[in-house]
């Protein structure tokens, strides 16, 4: 597999090409990382190119590296979720790692590597979200770039959302008789194993 580096501005353009189609999306500021809102929830998003991890015994392993940045100090203190996406240009795929784990690892060393597998990046189809269970305990989600709006629509089903501000209600949000979101942690824990990702 050939890995080409894409500039930060181009990575922003690629994600915005899809997000700008959603009325739920609002771009606020920045390039990499950038601040956005989706359904009025603020997120910091940082996209890096995926490349080979150069493991001789696991040639199909890819990685995205999270560098040390001054701007990450403020993001780490922020109550906003920090989304780290690895981008595979050849397959037009994003890999997202657990944002709780990623945020904890911000600026802990010169660079922190997050891993994926090329086989999943090649096989994932549009509208599909594949969870990889890696040997290091990480369980990233792999999906097509064109599915980024669906990703944000379903973000609460992929990883636990740890809110740093108390919520007024834990009741499910209903619209037209359909449950649109569930925020009650105990119920979410029971439902997650039943949801096919």
Placement of each model-derived feature along the sequence:
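Intrinsically disordered, charged low-complexity linkers and terminal tails
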Residues: 1-197
């Amino acid at each position: 597999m050939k890995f080409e580096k894409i500039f930060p501005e181009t990575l922003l353009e690629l994600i915005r090409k899809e997000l700008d189609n959603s009325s739920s999306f609002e771009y606020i500021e920045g390039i990499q990382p950038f601040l956005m809102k989706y359904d009025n929830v603020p997120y910091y998003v940082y996209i890096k190119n995926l490349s080979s991890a150069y493991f001789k015994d696991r040639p199909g392993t890819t990685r995205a590296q999270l560098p040390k940045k001054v701007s990450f100090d403020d993001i780490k203190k922020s109550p906003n979720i920090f989304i780290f996406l690895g981008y595979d240009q050849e397959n037009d795929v994003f890999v997202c790692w657990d944002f709780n784990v990623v945020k904890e690892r911000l600026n802990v060393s010169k660079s922190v590597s997050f891993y994926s597998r090329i086989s999943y990046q090649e096989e994932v189809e549009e509208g599909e979200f594949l969870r990889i269970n890696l040997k290091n305990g990480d369980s990233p989600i792999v999906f097509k770039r064109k599915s980024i709006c669906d990703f944000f629509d379903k973000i609460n089903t992929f990883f636990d959302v740890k809110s740093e501000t108390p919520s007024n209600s834990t009741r499910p949000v209903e619209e037209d008789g359909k449950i649109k979101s569930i925020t009650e942690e105990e119920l979410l824990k029971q439902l997650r194993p039943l949801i096919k990702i």
